From Swiss-Prot:
Species this chain originates from: Bos taurus
SUPFAM superfamilies for the chain: Mitochondrial cytochrome c oxidase subunit VIIIb (aka IX)
Residues passing through the membrane, by range: 37-60
Lineage: Eukaryota, Metazoa, Chordata, Craniata, Vertebrata
Protein name per UniProt: Cytochrome c oxidase subunit 8A, mitochondrial
Family: Belongs to the cytochrome c oxidase VIII family.
C-alpha cells in the first residue's frame, strides 16, 4: 500500500459521511396477549428441532460424506 492510499480513501468516503441518515419512526403497541412459559418452550424447542438438529446430524456424519465408495 502506498502512502497516498489513506488519503485517496478518505477523499472518496468523505462526501458519504456528511449525508444525513434518516431515522425510522417505529412505534409499537404492547402485545395483546403475553406469551406464557409453555409458548416460549414450544417455540424454542421447535427452532432447535428444525435448525440445529439436522445441521448437527450432518456435522456428526461428516466423515461418512468424505469417504468415496
Amino acid at each position: 500500500m502506498s502512502v497516498l492510499t489513506p488519503l485517496l480513501l478518505r477523499g472518496l468516503t468523505g462526501p458519504a459521511r456528511r449525508l444525513p441518515v434518516p431515522r425510522a419512526q417505529i412505534h409499537s403497541k404492547p402485545p395483546r396477549e403475553q406469551l406464557g412459559t409453555m409458548d416460549i418452550a414450544i417455540g424454542l424447542t421447535s427452532c432447535f428441532l428444525c435448525f440445529l438438529l439436522p445441521s448437527g446430524w450432518v456435522l456428526s456424519h461428516m466423515e461418512n460424506y468424505k469417504k468415496r465408495e
